[in-house]
Each structure stands twice: as C-alpha cells, then as structure tokens.
Amino acid sequence: MSYDSLMVFTGTANPKLAHDVVKYLNINLGRANVGRFSDGEVMVEILENVRGNDVFVLQSTCTPTNDSLMEILVIVDALKRASASRVTAAIPYFGYARQDRRTRSARVPITAKVVANMLTSVGVDRVLTMDLHSDQIQGFFDIPVDNVYGMPILLGDIWKHDYQNLIVVSPDVGGVVRARHLAKRLECDLAIIDKRRPKPNESKVMNIIGDVRGRTCVIIDDMVDTANTLCEAASALKREGAASVIAYSTHAVLSGKAVERVQTSDLDKLVVTDTIPLREDASKCNRIHQLSVASLLGESMLRISNESSLSSLFIE
C-alpha cells in the first residue's frame, strides 16, 4: 500500500480523536454520512471514492456502546461493497472486552468473542486497538490484530512531572505485569493492592503489599469505569501513609457516579487519554487530566499502511 491510498473514516463515537489523527497524518477525514433512520437504525453513506484504497475506520466502542459497535459494522460493510482494498477497524477502546472467558462454569456469554465474530463477518481485514483489557482477546480473531500500548504516552507525562520518591502501584493482582513494566521503566519500587470483589463493579481493598509510607504512589490500570476500585485504593494507600496518589489509565469509561467519586476521594489526580471522549462533568473536574493518543494511533496507522514495523514503537 502507498501512503496516498490511506483513508480514515469515523462514526459518531469520538470525532475529535479522528480529526486529531488525520491532522497528524496530514490527510483529510473521509467523507461519510453517518446518521439514523426515523426508527433509530444506523444509516451510512460513503461520500467519496474508496476503490482500491487502504481504509481505516476509527471508532471506539464506548457509550452508547451498542450504537458505536453497530456504526463500525455498517461503515465497514459500506466500504467493502464500495471496493476498498483493505479495511482496518481501528478501535482504540474495545468494548465488551471484560467478558473474555467463562468463570466457574457460569452460564454467561464470551462477548469479546462475539464482537470478534461480528467484525470478521462484515469483512474487516485487520484490527487495530489499544490496551486491550486482556491480551488473549487477540486470539479470538482469525485476522491480524495489532494491540498497541498507551504506555509511551502515560510514561512521557510521568517523566514530564518528575514525581519524587515514586512507587508504582498495581490496583490488583491482574495488573501486576503492566505495573511491573512501568516500574522497570521508571527504575522505582512496585507495590500491589490485594483485593476481593464481592460482586461486579464493586471491590474491597484488603491489603497493600509494599511500603508506601511517604511515597508518591502512581496507580496504573487499563481503564477506570465506576472508579470504585480506584478510589478505595487511594484511600487505602493514604491510610498507609502515602504522600500523594496519582492514577494513570488509558480508557476513561467513567460510568455512573465515577466523576463524583474521583472528586471527593483521596485521589490527588487522575490522568487518562482520549480513546474515549470525556463527559462534560469529567471535563470540568479539576482532578481529571486528559492526554492525547492521536499521534500514536496516527503513526500506527501509517506503519500498518506502509507494511512497516509496529513493535519498534515500543522497544525499550
């Protein structure tokens, strides 16, 4: 593929991110009419020639999740029927990813696999995503999946602020690998919060493994949803004598009363990226700060289109 053939289209989920990405690429955003019929069905019309082009559909499957997902599927179908040479679904925040396995023989779906099947069925040739909730989701696809990492963006902000007496904290055992990687890059200590989760979207902090007294604690996670876990973790760290608690998370889901919880919690600052657009109350919250991943996504798209290495973006 040549650079001249690269095109980017988007739906209604995160148009600002799409505009920032094409600005980085120095191209125009693909023209398409994405709307609704009178009964609420998704309506799509591609308004320019895409025949033979390398096309990316940039859309996070964030709230409204089902509409965002349906828009991707319908846009991809329209592009394939218009003879696009290759269509990559660029999904920075991959929704439905938290149900990635059956637990204890429960009668539940594996929604991450369902979404993978849906994307494949409409003719997606490749998937580009960022900080998947679990890496094994890549194996649910029979097409190439590029899962890029927001760590360089988050790490750059940490270096910029030059926090003193730093310690990286994993909010749970499942996030230890991510936290250990960050601690290695920062050449600092690692702490782990041991917790028990009595029911979905609720967690109880039980124990902190590591000495956080007098330290600047940086919590790292892939997403912040209800912020229950995050705020409880901040309180536990402060009780153990932490000087300050700063959280870094790629995906700002921030559902329900999450923003209110953050504002009234022991958390000093929450830093997120723009894979998901911030709600109005989150934008006004002085404890929530947003970084852009547009350059990282744009460079990833360019390298995919040019058949260049993506992994070299993340080599230490």
Curated annotation (Swiss-Prot):
Residues of the active site: 195
Binding locations of ATP: 39-41, 98-99
Enzyme class: transferase
Residues that, per the record, bind Mg(2+) 1: 133
One GO CC term, this protein: ribose phosphate diphosphokinase complex
Cofactor note: Binds 2 Mg(2+) ions per subunit.
Alphabetized InterPro entries for the sequence: PRib_PP_synth_CS, Pribosyltran_N, PRibTrfase_dom, PRTase-like, Rib-P_diPkinase, Rib-P_diPkinase_bac
Keywords associated with the record: ATP-binding, Cytoplasm, Kinase, Magnesium, Metal-binding, Nucleotide biosynthesis, Nucleotide-binding, Transferase
Binding positions for D-ribose 5-phosphate per the UniProt entry: 197, 221, 225-229
Cofactors named for this entry: Mg(2+)
GO biological process annotation, one example: ribonucleoside monophosphate biosynthetic process
Pathway: Metabolic intermediate biosynthesis; 5-phospho-alpha-D-ribose 1-diphosphate biosynthesis; 5-phospho-alpha-D-ribose 1-diphosphate from D-ribose 5-phosphate (route I): step 1/1
Main location: cytoplasm
Entry EC number(s): 2.7.6.1
GO terms, molecular function: ATP binding; kinase activity; magnesium ion binding; ribose phosphate diphosphokinase activity
Keyword Nucleotide-binding: yes
Transmembrane segments: none
Amino-acid positions noted as binding Mg(2+) 2 in the UniProt annotation, renumbered to this chain: 172
Family membership noted in the UniProt record: Belongs to the ribose-phosphate pyrophosphokinase family. Class I subfamily.
Xref: HAMAP family: RibP_PPkinase_B
Subunit structure: Homohexamer.
Function: Involved in the biosynthesis of the central metabolite phospho-alpha-D-ribosyl-1-pyrophosphate (PRPP) via the transfer of pyrophosphoryl group from ATP to 1-hydroxyl of ribose-5-phosphate (Rib-5-P).
Protein name according to UniProt: Ribose-phosphate pyrophosphokinase
Species per Swiss-Prot/TrEMBL record: Nitrosomonas europaea (strain ATCC 19718 / CIP 103999 / KCTC 2705 / NBRC 14298)
Gene this protein is translated from: prs
